[in-house]
Amino acid sequence: MSFFTNLRRVNKLYPNQASFLADNTRLLTSTPAGFTNVLNAPSVRNLGNNRYQPGYQLSNNRFVSTSDINRITRNNDVPNIRNVFQGISDPQINSLRQLRRMDNVPDFHYHTKQTRSNAVRQNFPETNVRTPEGVQNALQQNPRLHNHMRTLKVAGVGILLAGGGYLLFTASTLVQDIINAINRTGGSYYVQGRNAGENVESCLLLQRTCRQDRNLAQSDVNICSRDPLLANDSPLLTNMCQGFNYETEKTVCRGSNPAANPNSPQYVDISDLPAGQTIMCIEPYSFSDLVGDLGLDWLLGREGLVGKSSNSSDGIRNKIMPIIMMIGAVLFLGLILYFIYRYMTKGGGGGGGSGGAPTPIVIMQHPASTTAPRR
């Protein structure tokens, strides 16, 4: 079996340490170079009630779980990969790309979009909004983004979002289209990779989604017809959201995060799913998440700053231009008066006294010779 298939198999709790060691031996046979130094040090944490969380003991005595190894390698989370696999080279990290393609692993697309959304939220805090007023303000502060999204609305083509739902241009205003798209996001999603993981198919798992936006129109979201792990009438599924408290749990899902604390209601064991499939919880979007999902972050900020600078320059220019023109007029008038003065002092005014007459030039002649001619 492939590396990511074997890695998925150990992403679960074990009844004893020996069972994990046997599965980890199988995993090592498919582990690429650069990763064996960590996977050669299997360990477990005793959670009680005959439950053992599998993982690995790092050289600094830190424990890293198999769920974390799955998460960072499937997401192509390079900073955390380097943090766990000390001394790993770029070619060794890049070798995971082909292995992900072999198994149609889709996770890295979501991780890339989430990383981009986090950067948008941090660098442009005005986009971290979910209200019409907030969205309108963010668009006004980012005119290039505003113009681009107006162009999309004119084209009228719906866009499928990674976070579930669609951005549809059917409302009377662009702002309302954006709010409607935000309201369609959030929930537990069953995701399947296609075409080497470059494309995905996803659907909303309603019974694992414990908090839905009251404005959600289910006709605008692809609802799963079945749960990938449990029968639709299973009490474990139908009662999954019983006692849910969003203020305490800080997430809209249960049973949707394979990397969650195994003792929390958010944890799910997906070790039986193929490597190209996963279950994930996507929290409701803000405008920053929508911008990151659409890959429109390059339209933020720069044009707004240029526009503000241009507007500021125009204002300054309009204020100082009359002053510049006045100074120019005074200098021009002074130049004319100077030439008039020069003309008058050089005698250009006609007749007058001797003061204006030229000084006579006297030419001295030599006297004639007085010597008599010789006879």
Curated annotation (Swiss-Prot):
More about this protein: Expressed late in infection.
Function: Structural protein that is specific for occlusion-derived virus (ODV) envelopes but not of budded virus (BV).
Species lineage: Viruses, Viruses incertae sedis, Naldaviricetes, Lefavirales, Baculoviridae
Keyword Transmembrane: yes
Pfam family, any one: Baculo_E56
Organism in which the protein naturally occurs: Bombyx mori nuclear polyhedrosis virus
Name of this protein: Occlusion-derived virus envelope protein E56
Topology class, membrane: Multi-pass membrane protein
Glycosylation sites recorded in the entry for this protein: N183
Origin: domain of life: Viruses
GO cellular component term, pick one: viral envelope
